[in-house]
């Protein structure tokens, strides 16, 4: 299996640091988390079950439909675009390697073992990467991080003490916008309240009565 990882590094010729982090972490077991620079962690994404993530094909179709022009552009759009490019390229190289291994292994059991390992273990990592960066581009990084935290709290809460349904990512932007608006408002104490205005009226009446007496 170590030889398989070595073949992966040789075939994964992505020139950027993001791809190097991904490949080197798989090979030598280095403590490299590809999500840390984006404010998340592998552990945070692990709260989401494996069947939560769409298939690689569906994620690739989504990325192509929404961000094809930006992904194919030579310009640097954002760190998420760069990471998404490298994840797509690594998956393509990985599929090429898996096909080559499958065609050249004579033992059917070994061939199935390699294919299943790629589809389950590495396939899940690619699905997580694709989902994370596509979601950050679609909904915003802060919204995705808030969703991961909310889902982690929900899944770790005993069923008797949590809502029946898990948080939904598409509904979080509405609450996030409201919170940002609340933060941007000026403090209400700067403007006089109706109670203060009412409290001033008796004083004015007293002053007017004193002037009339004089």
Curated annotation (Swiss-Prot):
- Where does this chain mainly localize? secreted
PTM note: Phosphorylated.
- Which residues are tagged with the site Cleavage? 185-186
Q: Where in the cell is it found?
A: Secreted; Host nucleus
UniProt keyword annotations, A-Z: Disulfide bond, Host nucleus, Host-virus interaction, Repeat, Secreted, Signal, Viral immunoevasion
Give any Gene Ontology cellular component.
extracellular region
Q: Quick one: a GO biological-process term for this protein?
A: symbiont entry into host cell
Q: Where is this region: 3 X 8 AA repeats of S-P-R-R-R-R-S-Q?
A: 186-208
Q: Where is this region: HBEAG?
A: 25-27
Those residues forming the propeptide, per the database entry, are 186-214
Biased composition, Basic residues: where in the chain?
178-207
Extract the signal peptide range: 1-19
Per the database entry, which stretches of residues form a coiled coil? none
Q: Which Pfam families does this UniProt record tie to the protein?
A: Hep_core_N, Hepatitis_core
The Swiss-Prot or TrEMBL record annotates one GO molecular function as: structural molecule activity
Q: sequence repeats located where?
A: 186-192, 193-200, 201-208
Ranges for the region named Disordered are 165-214
Which SUPFAM superfamilies does this chain map to? Hepatitis B viral capsid (hbcag)
Query: What family name appears in the similarity comment?
Result: Belongs to the orthohepadnavirus precore antigen family.
Q: What does this protein do?
A: May regulate immune response to the intracellular capsid in acting as a T-cell tolerogen, by having an immunoregulatory effect which prevents destruction of infected cells by cytotoxic T-cells. This immune regulation may predispose to chronicity during perinatal infections and prevent severe liver injury during adult infections.
Question: How would you summarize the oligomeric state and partners of this protein?
Answer: Homodimerizes.
> Know the name of this protein?
External core antigen
